[in-house]
Amino acid sequence: MKSVTLSLLQSAANAFDFGGPVLCDAHHYGEGHINDTFVVWREDHSKRFILQRINTDTFTNPVGLMENVCGVTRHLRAKILAEGGDPARETLSVIPTLSGSTCYLDADGAAWRAYDFVEDTICLQQVGSETDFRTVAETLGKFQNQLEDYPASTLHETIARFHDTPNRYANFEKALAADALGRAKNIAPEIEFIHAREQDCHVLLDQLAAGEIPLRVTHNDTKLNNVLIDAATGKGICVIDLDTVMPGLSAYDFGDSIRTGANDCAEDEPDQSKVHFDLHLYEVFAKGYLSTAGASMSMAEKKSLAWGARLMTLECGIRFLTDYLEGDHYFHIARPDHNLDRARTQFTLVRQMEEVFDQMLEIVCPDNH
């Protein structure tokens, strides 16, 4: 997609019902790497909004994506009102176009959407304290609980087979067989690591197929910075970035949060001796998550959360290594072997999780382990 100029941004902004003319700033807002995000505000500076250009290379059906977002936020708004909450702060509010649509297609066919700006909030880029991590956990658990009765089958799959770990394994095998850049000879230990865990890749989907765990509405990208925290109270109030809300498993959301939050190193740490899975932070997150989501979960589903931590970490490592074999086309790299370092970090975390897996199960399901 072409770069966003101020005139292009203003043209897109003029398509939305902001309640009057708005001013634009062509500087990107936030930490996101997929969509192009900007802040616009009314001419009298009384209100701010988020204006985004959706990345249609990643999300090929923006209209279906916005149907998901509108359906889910409408459902959340009703739940929040019933609980005496403030839906203007506790879920995203979609701004329609002047013609009443949920998104605007510009002259180049690019898709744009707009939200109210949720004021006086912060989002975390890393775990600063146990309290922070528990706050994120409680907010994500509440999000899952509020969507418990949402019909998952009505949602569009915005990224096909996103957390299908066996499919990620199959893609790795194809990349390994092709070995387009001759890199396979450099990664024999990593290849062996993945091959030894082929059966693990099937655990969660096998449990789903057997009816042991339910298909839910899940977020599927539960990074810390996708939870807005009230700047005054420190409480988590709103889950954002709903583009990957799809049918999925609670283990996906739980596991991805553990993968990114329950360790004390960067995702691309080149020194594997510094990589450490923090079982205590895992427990902090698990207790927070289950305090808001656990009432609707069976013993089997609670046990699946521990598997989610293992498999989301393994899956991510497989994706990094696949991209390394294919020439680093998907994940941005800043140095040679960047994706290899990323994969090795994930595999170190998996290995450490395996060593304490009985304890991980005990933490999420103490009554039936």
Set out the residue ranges of the language-model regions.
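Juxta-kinase regulatory segment immediately upstream of eukaryotic protein kinase catalytic domains
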Residues: 1-26
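ATP-dependent phospho-/nucleotidyl transfer catalytic cores
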Residues: 27-31, 52-53, 59-63, 118-134, ...
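Active-site activation/catalytic loop segments of kinase-like enzymes and analogous catalytic loops
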Residues: 251-294, 311-330
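Conserved active-site aspartate in kinases
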Residues: 241
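Conserved ATP-binding subdomain of kinase catalytic cores across diverse folds
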Residues: 25-174, 248-250, 261-262, 266-273, ...
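Long, compositionally biased intrinsically disordered regions
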Residues: 353-356
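Small/polar glycine-rich anion-binding or flexible loop at a beta-alpha turn
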Residues: 302-312
